[in-house]
């Protein structure tokens, strides 16, 4: 990946969580190692259109991307090859905005402007099959997310409401009408639940009735407009154990805990500005976890930022420290907040993670000395 403004528009995470597929302007396609993002590659493709969304197949061997002009691409992960999997002859000139494979990978659902939504798959003879779903609306399909283990998916439509797609590809509108929904993510936990977000800081929690998806409903008390937060929600990604991170514009993050039914400040824009004015002016495109309350985010310009908390006190989920920035295709910049100078514990933790070999050895020696002193006390 080269430096500069890459125009990243979206990401997806592979089934085994080891790969990130990023894509955007001018058919830019990038593969990133989720745990070591400095290992990344630009995948060549000659298109000149924006790729807005993507989804890995549950089988882990391919991924599809959708975007402008009705274009659909398929990537084969074994050799990182790209092929055209659909175009204007199938989807017209429709702006394709969202895509997700269903639970067993038998069909993908592709959504676009004007409420268009198709079920899509490749055929054994190398062709494709794309069938328009009945009962579609007339507003852009802003998000699609599917439950693993069930061939049930949830969709959001900007001002058009929230819908459920059942095992027979029936589309059922279940509520949330008139809200500017921008994205949705489903957690395939013991109680299957999807979280929808809107640009006006509204969150909807949808408990899916797996036995009869059409009976799923979004009630008034399932929808909450957050107070005390600033910005517009732009995207949501599942992290782990019912935790999601919600991206904000301007640059910020909210943690949502579906088990607790609560949302928490994770990173406020004012903190991001104090950290780095240039980075805070960028748009967060996606996030993924790499450990307990640790992970990465990627911006529209292709900047990757590693994050993790100083300490996780009960009820305190505020992001308090940045531990690294990677400018894709350029140098790695190791940075930390001013809190380092006033917190020996944090300083040592950071040194062990990102310090030089000699610095790490020095910290370990000091910790061993302190441990022996405590043992003699």
Functional labels for PLM-detected ranges:
Residues 1-377:
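Residue-level hotspots at or immediately adjacent to binding/recognition sites across diverse folds
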